[in-house]
Amino acid sequence: MPSPCPYLKDRDSRMEYRYIDGCDFAVNDALARRGFRRFGKYFSKPNCAGCRECVNIRVDALNFKFNKSARRTMRKNENTKIILTKPLIDDAHVALYKKYHKFMQEKREWKYYELDFRRYYELYIAGHAEFGKEIAYFADGRLIGVDLVDILSDGISAVYCYYDPDFADLSIGRYSLYQQILLAQQLNLRWIYLGYYVKDCPSLAYKAHYKPYERLCEYVALDETPVWKKAE
């Protein structure tokens, strides 16, 4: 059934869902390359009649060049501690998630949903198997950012990132993407699967700034080969 579009006002959206209990590396890999996004054990992608504004993009990590702005962001975070681990859940994670979303409700008019431990587990811990990872960011021992990712055969899928708005000067959102790119380079994985780019949605339009990147050309079924093309 159609529901209000979360990205563009005055539009409806229709999502295609898959629930997979015990998803393995190969299945998650295939779904990500066909435009599905994973949250816990649920996989989804838009399938809206007459609208193709949600465009899946993947950044070419092995050919990405860090410009002056990127290097400046890296320097600002010289004292930021980074820990790569399996996805975790505790009071600090849930509190930071809520703080970030309340901030985005005020800044971008995001709809705020109350979230407890159970809901956080269902969205970000369940189903991570061997491919789900967490990149956690700390300042003076305090958790200030969480970047949840999936490791794929040819890249890294960006699942979700949230951070402490009190540390906005560190640009943790951008910094986390740069760290994904560096990790992909270390692992010799070419792509960062960034999810949906929507040119008229401020929360998603930024993704086109990270070049070079490719676009998933069109809706692709599970039994079809995905076609990605380099963006001009």
Give the residues covered by each predicted segment.
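A conserved beta-strand-loop-helix scaffold within acyl/acetyltransferase catalytic domains
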Residues: 42-50, 59-169, 209
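Terminal substrate-recognition subdomain of acyl/acetyltransferases
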Residues: 1-81, 86, 190-232
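Short polybasic/polar patches that bind polyanions
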Residues: 32, 102, 185
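A structural signal for well-ordered alpha-helical segments within the folded catalytic domains
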Residues: 25, 91, 174-178
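Short secondary-structure boundary micro-motifs
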Residues: 3-5, 13, 118-121, 132, ...
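Aromatic (often tryptophan-rich) hydrophobic motifs at membrane interfaces
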Residues: 135-219
